[in-house]
Regions:
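Asp-box/WD-like beta-propeller blade repeats and closely related beta-sheet repeat scaffolds
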Residues: 1-25
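Beta-strand-turn-beta hairpins that frame and shape the catalytic cleft
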Residues: 25-27, 64
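A conserved catalytic-loop motif detector
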Residues: 33
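Beta-propeller domain segments
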Residues: 18, 36-66, 70, 76-78, ...
Length: 243
């Protein structure tokens, strides 16, 4: 892809650019998450962002030929992990939320796509995470085109833990309750007064394929004094069933 065809050159940034790629086995296309280059952008940016998929997700045909870019999600701040549920093909993704609102707010998110559409909106910039309104947009009415297509998060994670990579457990080593559960990595905070994160979370799904319960699965990468000994980035199942 030539420069400017993924991200318009005037919008190139070292912040939150193209993040994660994954192939959807249902349509054999490549899905790419596109982070927003701001903590919270001004309203003048969103017509372009929604059009090209910045702060959202796009997909491409994987074969040579015409670039068939499609926007499949908007209103995402900065997703650094997505995967497809092997059982029903649904798209799930993490989302890192707004900074500068305090140590305990807003929550990070684990989302399930309500549909793969350029109209499906996941809350940003009017929501900073979960149902918490951003300071910049809290007094602004949510446009109807967003409100009627709003897809709420499945899970609110603790604020500023930096939820990154995620995957569905496909191995046989772990007990049955973990089959097809979502494991997700919390990289850990960068500007919170009290550091948090640095652990692996697990989210169990119910019979309808929605989030039922989320809890820590593995911890120990941070000392009692808040010093990081390790910072998980992603979680993948190895061929023997280990993580």
């Amino acid at each position: 892809i030539d420069q400017g065809n993924l991200i318009p050159e005037e919008e190139e940034s070292y912040n939150h650019t193209a993040r994660v790629c994954a192939i959807n086995k249902k349509d054999n296309k490549l899905y790419v998450s596109m982070g927003q280059p701001f903590n919270v952008a001004g309203p003048d940016k969103y017509p372009l962002y929604d059009q090209v998929g910045i702060g959202g997700m796009i997909r491409f045909n994987r074969f040579p030929g015409k670039l068939d870019r499609e926007v499949v999600a908007i209103g995402i701040r900065n997703s650094v992990g997505h995967a497809f549920n092997p059982k029903d093909g649904s798209l799930w993704f993490t989302d890192n939320q707004v900074d500068g609102m305090g140590d305990e707010t807003p929550p990070g998110e684990l989302n399930k796509a309500c549909s793969l559409s350029s109209k499906t909106w996941y809350g940003h910039p009017y929501y900073g995470g979960g149902n918490v309104r951003t300071n910049e947009y809290k007094d602004k009415k949510i446009p109807e085109k967003y409100a009627k297509n709003y897809c709420k998060p499945q899970v609110d994670m603790i604020a500023h833990a930096a939820d990154l990579g995620m995957s569905f457990y496909s191995g046989k080593m772990f007990p049955k309750k973990y089959k097809n559960a979502i494991f997700s990595a919390q990289h850990g905070s960068w500007n919170a007064v009290k550091p948090r994160g640095a652990r692996v979370m697990v989210t169990y799904l119910d019979k309808k394929g929605n989030a039922a319960k989320t809890e820590p699965f593995a911890e120990g990468w941070m000392t009692e004094d808040g010093v990081y000994l390790g910072r998980p980035v992603d979680v993948q199942t190895y061929i023997d069933g280990s993580l």
